[in-house]
Amino acid sequence: MFFSKAGKAAVEWAKGSKVPYKEFALTLEKIEELSGKKKVDELAQFFTKVLDFSPDDLTACVYMSVNQLGPSYEGLELGVAENSLIKAVAKATGRTEGKIKEDLRAKGDLGTVAQQSRSNQKMLAVPKALTVPTVFNKLTEIAKLSGTSAMNKKVDAISALLIACQGIEARFLVRMLAGKMRIGLGEQSVLSALGHAFTLSKITDQKVRGDKLDSLKDANVKRVKTAYCECPNYNRLIEVALTEGVEALVEKCKLSPGIPLKPMLAHPTKGIDEIMRRFRNQTMTCEWKYDGERGQIHKREDGQIFIYSRNQENNTTKYPDIIEKISSCIGDGVTSFIVDAEVVAIDEAGLILPFQVLSTRKRKNATDDNGVKVVVFLFDLLYFNGEPLVRKPLRKRRELLRTNFKKIDGSFYFATSVDTNDTDEINSFFDEAVQNKCEGLMIKTLDTEATYEISRRSHSWLKMKKDYVDGVGDTLDLVVMGAYSGVGKRTGVYGGYLLGCYNPTTEEYESVCKIGTGFTDEDLAEQYKILQDKKIDKSPSYYQFDHTLKPDDTFSPYLVFEVKCADITISPRHKAASGLTDDGKGISLRFPRFLRIRDDKNSDDATSSEQVLEMYKNQEAFANQKIEKADAVDEDDEFEEKEDEEEELNMTNVSEGSSKENPVKEEIKKETPKSVSPKKFEKKPPVKSSPVNKSPVKSSPIKKEAEKKKGPVASIFSSSTKKNEKDVKVESPSPIRKKKLPSDSDESDEETSTNKKQPAKKRSRVAIDSDSD
């Protein structure tokens, strides 16, 4: 028998019957009102009841708790547009769409509007009670609808479900359909609740309490989370737990080809000094950081091959050319594997193209003839011939990768790398990577603390990019919460945006800056078009920003911008990390600049509040920064639109009352150095051998082949992947040493000057970090 904390028997339904949807909705209502650990406890009680009375329904309950219909890689998504939901609510309740919209403006939550509309509706007969499996199956059917009349069919199906809802059920049904539950319950909390439930459902002795019970729950939570990391499939996880026990999860739910895992990610770093501090007395390797898309390539024992994105989306149909050619890359005796790689766009000469180009590739049936040509850079092996390798050190994984896979010219290569702890060599290797259209370097431990940490951003991997060396340690991916109407040159489009980070604990978006810099006219036109379908009448309750920042138009969380900035500061108005700072104030960006749209990220994948706080604390100036000084700066006074200057395209950020030039203008306007042909590299004197490595420089066979074709392909593959066999050709001042690269011009000093009026250049959108690390 399951007992609540009050000691009384919890509300039950008949054993063996289906879980009532109302019981699930009431649980969500309670969770919405609770905070912290109490949310997990409440959900754990519900899961325990399900295990006791209707264990077959547990999988549907768990998926609905995380607002999913299946594993991410199956691609079943709800996310019904707000306008369609309004139509369905109006149809189900007999009210006009205008009245529904009016209530929505007042309430700010369509789920609440639907609940009240149904409660006020007179019914001739009480509808049959909904069950969790019934709702889950209906939602799955709705998600699978496609074709020209799919939206009308969805509205009809949703309307029918709403008619069957009673009371609180309508609120959470609509929220699920919208794709946002907004109860402050993240996936990690659901996994914890599941671990607690597996513990509580087995305990019949009420004397098992206190530390002993907590210890049992903690052990099972660890089992559940470990199993889910390697096998992110609730169907499989719950099946094993029910049939073989929670103790069998780690052994039975291992990494398996065909089930993508969330990749290991890197922490940003601003220079060599930080790298050497982090990796003191550790062997490490440096790899070029390619400007592409993360590609997780799986081969099963039956020969099927799949390619998944960093978000576990199935990209197999996007890269049929890779699937077709990969067999030639696989060595003899290889039966199954999971490879971590980077897919990069190249031109006909083999020159690396930016991620912006790759993002234009067709999502289905793309080839060299009708799409963007790509190559694959392999850098890690996670599973090989039936054995998971994630707990083995990188050196061993890399050895197996290079032994059992082959380079195929024009298609597959190993990531260009060098094993070294010498700062001069790292500097030179960084310069070479930047010269060859890469974003910078990935620095990784080889032997100690060198396992593959699934779904974690680890300090065992560091990324050093050209865009933030000696500046803020990383770019940010921020959600567009709202926009401000444009004037002057920007009349008819949006002139600027309100951006926010994501707080996964509260499931809220917290404002972090206003932005109006870095956009081309093409960018603004494209964004305006995209956002028209995302407009909502009122800022939702899960948007946190000061009333003085209210935008002209507000949007549902959809579009994600990659942004860089000069500085991160305490803010009296912005809400980012406001509950995490010492004084409770928020954090904001100074001189933010748009880089590109992150098509590969959902709104919940945006930079988190904790990451923003960490970036603030990691600034070099943090130790000397006084809050009083930070408070004196109103970062939004720097948001100014140049509406009367025909020659100016971009907005200029100016501090109120300041006549000084933008202090970040040099740093943010440097362009990527132009690619240099292999012959130009050879004219420069080679870098002197370091004390660590005095072996002669060897010429890469790939480079020789490329030179015969008289193309710059050698620029991509010029360095050896073996220790002490580097092919570093460029001797140029490193940006790490605060000097410009030879290709930097003084134009960047003029381009953002606030005292001079210079014609704005028509530039292509800067394409940088795909954050595919």
From Swiss-Prot:
Residues 687-700 have a biased composition (Low complexity). GO terms for biological process: cell division; DNA biosynthetic process; DNA recombination; DNA repair; lagging strand elongation; Okazaki fragment processing involved in mitotic DNA replication. Keywords: ATP-binding, Cell cycle, Cell division, DNA damage, DNA recombination, DNA repair, DNA replication, Ligase, Magnesium, Metal-binding, Nucleotide-binding, Nucleus. GO terms for molecular function: ATP binding; DNA binding; DNA ligase (ATP) activity; metal ion binding. Belongs to the ATP-dependent DNA ligase family. The active site is at residue 289. GO terms for cellular component: nucleus. Its cofactor is Mg(2+). The record marks 37, 311, 489, 514 as: Interaction with target DNA. It is an enzyme of class 6 (ligase). Mg(2+) 1 binds at residue 342. Residues 633-649 have a biased composition (Acidic residues). It catalyses: ATP + (deoxyribonucleotide)n-3'-hydroxyl + 5'-phospho-(deoxyribonucleotide)m = (deoxyribonucleotide)n+m + AMP + diphosphate. Mg(2+) 2 binds at residue 439. It comes from Caenorhabditis elegans. Its EC number is 6.5.1.1. Residues 626-773 are annotated as: Disordered. PANTHER family: DNA LIGASE 1, DNA LIGASE 1/3 FAMILY MEMBER. The lineage of its organism: Eukaryota, Metazoa, Ecdysozoa, Nematoda, Chromadorea. Residues 180-189, 362-364 are annotated as: Interaction with target DNA. Its main location: nucleus. It is found in: Nucleus. DNA ligase that seals nicks in double-stranded DNA during DNA replication, DNA recombination and DNA repair. InterPro entries: ATP-dep_DNA_ligase (IPR050191), DNA_ligase_ATP-dep (IPR000977), DNA_ligase_ATP-dep_C (IPR012309), DNA_ligase_ATP-dep_cent (IPR012310), DNA_ligase_ATP-dep_CS (IPR016059), DNA_ligase_ATP-dep_N (IPR012308), DNA_ligase_N_sf (IPR036599), NA-bd_OB-fold (IPR012340). ATP binds at residues 287, 294, 342, 444, 463. Residues 658-685 have a biased composition (Basic and acidic residues). This is DNA ligase 1.
